């Protein structure tokens, strides 16, 4: 039995679907009040609970061999949820999940972090991800840390202030640093693979097949839509200040500024080899943008 924590999320649901398609028994920890119908339809066993409720995590882990943790509270915080904070859910809550998994005799723990998590930008999400990676490094379970690059569907989309339809793109810093933007579905395929393959690596860092900068992506958007994009640049110094000022007041926004700054500071060091090794044919950033432009027509 695999337990997925975060199975109602964008990445998490894709992982659950793939695990079920491959015939695996899957349980999901779902927060009280969240719609579980999409999970029940595909034969998932649903246990209600929350990362901030340790007793629910103990019940969820009973009889489980592998835990896959994709959950993060950042999306709900951005949507206005006052509690829990990133510290409470992504850091303390994840530590409780690791404790519960160990106590239940779970053999493997797959955790979704991100590439560049060690860049020391000092955001709440970075602290939570690093603390969880460190907690897992002390565990006797077989642990797999998955570190994908920025997702195409988030950072090359309106949500990530890359709005081809409205012709508006925000860039932190110069925007010339190349990134291997990766498709969420390709990340899901890799997370699924390392959850079930016989001998998974301890850390897997990867991105999509094509490295392009945000400025190059913006030029591509102009060519594809035949419309001029209004590109708004925010200096790195302002992003650093925003991270510091928002740290306590708005942990999600501070972390979003951190993600943008990371994309400008951190030249992507990884490629799509871990995907190809597993037979996954990844979508390039260019193909993703071409498809988005086609949908806009
Ligand atoms: N976006 C990127 O570019 C990027 C890059 C690298 C890594 N990542 C990582 O990839 C993962 C993204 O996953 P996703 O797309 O599935 O995120 P998502 O769509 O925001 O979903 C978050 C999931 O976490 C669950 N959750 C939130 N708070 C919880 C709590 N207190 N207890 C239990 N579950 C809780 C949510 O449940 P509800 O549905 O009930 O809210 C939902 O299932 C994250 O770990 C993120 O840090 C993202």
Tell me the role of every PLM-derived stretch.
Residues 30-103, 118:
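NAD(P)H-binding glycine-rich loop region in Rossmannoid oxidoreductase-like domains
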Residues 154-162, 194-204, 227:
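Glycine/proline-rich active-site loop of Rossmann-fold NAD(P)-dependent oxidoreductases
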Residues 219-266:
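Terminal hydrophobic/aromatic helix or amphipathic segment near a protein terminus
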Residues 73-165:
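Glycine-/Pro-rich loop/turn segments that contact NAD(P) or position catalytic residues
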Residues 2-24:
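N-terminal Rossmann NAD(P)H-binding glycine-rich loop of SDR-like oxidoreductase domains
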